[in-house]
């Protein structure tokens, strides 16, 4: 992560985009508050907002570079106070085994040090079930191919929360 490099122009654009998304999410977080009401003497109902303990972010790779997906998913988790954020990125299709350096720069800018390289469904399974080196997460978010979506749906069957099923345009 530390050695990832992008052009000065892209770095500046990523810093600005992260700032914008952070400011929006911080404003949103201020508007979301705990609340409760007493519906009858001694009986209260309401909502208490607490961050989940861990989240896995799947950042697609392949036909294009998607650092925007990285900051759009990671910044809300950072602002919410999620204690552990794990990022899963498929390797670039050039056969080098490397991952998109722009995604690594986003992770570095946000202080995320837990980044793994694996293809779609295998990466989703690793985040959901865990491996010898990857602890399982409570929730997995991120768009992907139909196979990635199917893997996320399968994780739901095993008690891992995921977001709504997304297509390529969401």
State what each model feature region is.
Residues 1-53:
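N-terminal Rossmann-like NAD(P)+-binding subdomain of aldehyde/semialdehyde dehydrogenases
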Residues 35-105:
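Conserved small-residue-rich beta-alpha loop and adjacent elements
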Residues 50-62, 107-111, 133-134, 165-169:
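Glycine/charged-rich beta-loop-alpha catalytic/anionic-binding loops adjacent to active sites
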Residues 29, 63, 93, 123, ...:
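Surface-exposed, flexible loop/turn segments at secondary-structure boundaries
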Residues 111-170:
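Conserved NAD(P)+-binding/catalytic subdomain of aldehyde/semialdehyde dehydrogenases
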Residues 13-16, 20-23, 54, 72, ...:
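Alpha-helical scaffold segments in soluble metabolic enzymes
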Residues 85, 91-108, 117-129, 139:
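Alpha-helical recognition segments enriched in aromatics with Gly/Pro capping
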Residues 2-17, 47, 65, 95, ...:
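Catalytic cores of large soluble enzymes that bind and process phosphate-bearing ligands
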